[in-house]
């Protein structure tokens, strides 16, 4: 795949670690210059040109992000030291130095220099000697800054084959009935970024992700979020368990919000039925920063909310008057975990801890004997009985899931890292359950799952069929995927969480054999680098 441009443009592109690997044809201070070949005619070229225009637009908006991030970060710690009565002269000098840079000139080296000054000054001016305590303080100061920003809805649009699609992302702070947030604890329009590891009331980084067609009709919706674990609290503590329970209740409330007709019925006093399929993307091993204990927190909290026979689950939700009202839900939750990073797919780690969990959940979703004899039961069979038109799609996805699991294909990349998690999420939506998916932060692996879902939903909407298993993306599908990666709202969510856009899934490793297949799935190094963005800064 080759990105082209009408005429011949030379455009400035951010250099440094964030965009390493871009094709350089000339250099200025701090930037690289990239040339694009001329293309004149053909339907195929229209798609390429549309992608190129989007690329150039994103490039323009991204160019100054590194400088803005550095300035914001310096100012945050300047104010923190000033508030504590410390000497701000060195931070101020760094701010003045940053003011001399032009857009596009700040790279990772400059951020490292800034972070070194911040660390030295916070230690000296606030009198912190312990290294771990210092790191915690620095992280908390910037987390508080990010959490004090307004988080609003993100709405993006793309065109494909003459059809328009809308991507609507609604943060938890805007999950409202009228002007009132539905949750027990108010968000007050703010966000809870992924670094909020001790947060006990809210899930970090929770969004309703919806896809609509050109008539505004929903063709997919689900909840994406950070892990249901206050993993900054002491492991196995009652405080941490209570926090997980609060987060799980908030997720169920968000799932109910995603189904307005059910929410309305529940608030009117009716007991409603709600099914949730939770698909986690963690790698639960001791090598992944505690993801094993995080998954345990999440699974225990969600399972603990399952309704017992004859005893609906009770939730508190704010109505349009802002009053808390108890609602009754016949709640059924199944929980999966499919690792999607290099440790899981290239080194085979983390599966031993989740195979049993996944097998149990498959029985609930597709029936006790499905993996053995292919007879669909469980929630899927119930859905077919209630809604016969979904039968073909359910069977198609179920058979792919069966093949993946029986052949253990989910434990390898094989050109499609999210093959099982994506199909499980699509099956959940197809049978009328609310799909929820998460990683640790809710921005990188979760964002890639979001993009993979959107690509597949658009394909299904246009062709009437889901992709075949083990099929490679065509050049046209790569262009669609690239468009979604650049214009689906994921970059905005990453920036809200860290201060800069960029997906950490995009990695270049010393051994290329350990890398995931996203270079191939995207098909263009410049777009790959743009999606990676400034993730190395954070």
From Swiss-Prot:
Keywords assigned: Hydrolase, Plasmid, Secreted, Virulence
The species this protein was found in: Shigella sonnei
Family designation: Belongs to the phosphatase IpgD/SopB family.
Subcellular location: Secreted
The enzyme's E.C. designation: 3.1.3.78
GO cellular component: extracellular region
Gene it is expressed from: ipgD
Free-text comment on this protein's domains from its UniProt entry: Contains the consensus sequence Cys-X(5)-Arg characteristic of Mg-independent phosphatases.
Location, primary (coarse class): secreted
Residues forming coiled coils: none
Catalytic activity: a 1,2-diacyl-sn-glycero-3-phospho-(1D-myo-inositol-4,5-bisphosphate) + H2O = a 1,2-diacyl-sn-glycero-3-phospho-(1D-myo-inositol-5-phosphate) + phosphate
Name by which UniProt lists this protein: Inositol phosphate phosphatase IpgD
Short motif CX5R motif, span: 439-445
Active site: 439
Function as written in the Swiss-Prot or TrEMBL entry: Converts phosphatidylinositol 4,5-bisphosphate (PtdIns 4,5-P2) to PtdIns 5-P. IpgD is injected by Shigella into the host cell and is required for invasion. The accumulation of PtdIns 5-P causes membrane ruffling and actin cytoskeleton rearrangements at the entry site.
Any GO molecular function: phosphatidylinositol-4,5-bisphosphate 4-phosphatase activity
UniProt-listed InterPro entries: IpgD/SopB
């Amino acid at each position: 795949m080759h990105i082209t441009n009408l005429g011949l443009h030379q455009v400035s592109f951010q250099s440094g670690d964030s965009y390493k690997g871009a094709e350089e044809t000339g250099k200025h201070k701090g930037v690289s210059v990239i040339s694009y070949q001329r293309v004149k005619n053909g339907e195929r070229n229209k798609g390429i040109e549309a992608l190129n225009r989007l690329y150039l637009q994103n490039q323009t908006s991204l160019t100054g992000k590194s400088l803005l991030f550095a300035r914001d970060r310096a100012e945050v710690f300047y104010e923190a030291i000033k508030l504590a009565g410390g000497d701000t002269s060195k931070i101020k000098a760094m701010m003045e130095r940053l003011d001399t840079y032009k857009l596009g000139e700040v790279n990772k080296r400059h951020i490292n220099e800034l972070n070194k000054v911040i660390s030295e000054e916070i230690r000296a001016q606030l009198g912190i000697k312990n290294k771990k305590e210092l790191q915690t303080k620095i992280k908390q100061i910037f987390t508080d800054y990010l959490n004090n920003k307004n988080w609003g809805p993100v709405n993006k649009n793309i065109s494909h084959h003459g059809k328009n699609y809308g991507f609507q992302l609604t943060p938890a702070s805007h999950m409202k009935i009228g002007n009132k947030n539905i949750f027990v604890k108010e968000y007050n329009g703010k966000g809870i970024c992924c670094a909020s590891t001790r947060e006990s009331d809210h899930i970090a980084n929770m969004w309703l992700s919806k896809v609509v067609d050109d008539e505004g009709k929903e063709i997919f919706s689900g909840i994406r979020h950070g892990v249901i674990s206050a993993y900054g609290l002491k492991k196995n503590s009652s405080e941490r368990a209570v926090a997980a329970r609060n987060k799980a209740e908030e997720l169920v409330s968000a799932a109910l919000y995603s189904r307005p007709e059910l929410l309305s019925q529940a608030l009117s006093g009716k007991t409603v039925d709600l099914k949730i399929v939770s698909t986690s993307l963690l790698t639960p091993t001791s090598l992944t920063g505690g993801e094993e204990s995080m998954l345990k927190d999440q699974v225990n909290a969600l399972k603990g909310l399952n309704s017992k026979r004859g005893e609906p689950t009770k939730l508190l939700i704010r109505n349009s008057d802002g009053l808390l009202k108890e609602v009754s839900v016949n709640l059924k939750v199944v929980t999966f975990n499919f690792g999607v990073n290099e440790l899981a797919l290239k080194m085979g780690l983390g599966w031993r801890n989740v195979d049993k969990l996944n097998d149990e959940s498959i029985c609930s979703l597709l029936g006790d004997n499905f993996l053995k004899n292919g007879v669909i039961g469980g929630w899927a069979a119930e859905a077919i009985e209630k809604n016969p038109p979904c039968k073909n799609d359910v069977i198609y996805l179920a058979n792919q899931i069966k093949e993946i699991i029986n052949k253990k294909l989910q434990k390898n990349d094989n050109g499609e890292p999210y093959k099982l998690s994506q199909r499980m999420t699509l099956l959940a939506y197809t049978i009328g359950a609310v799909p929820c998916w998460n990683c640790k932060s809710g921005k990188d692996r979760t964002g890639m799952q979001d993009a993979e879902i959107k690509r597949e939903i658009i394909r299904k909407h246009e062709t009437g069929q889901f992709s075949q298993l083990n099929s490679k993306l065509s050049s046209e599908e790569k262009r669609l995927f690239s468009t979604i990666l650049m214009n689906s709202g994921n970059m905005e969510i990453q920036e809200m969480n860290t201060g800069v856009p960029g997906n950490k899934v995009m990695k270049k490793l010393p051994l290329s054999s350990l890398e995931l297949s996203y270079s191939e799935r995207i098909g263009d190094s410049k777009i790959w680098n743009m999606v990676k963005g400034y993730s190395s800064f954070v």
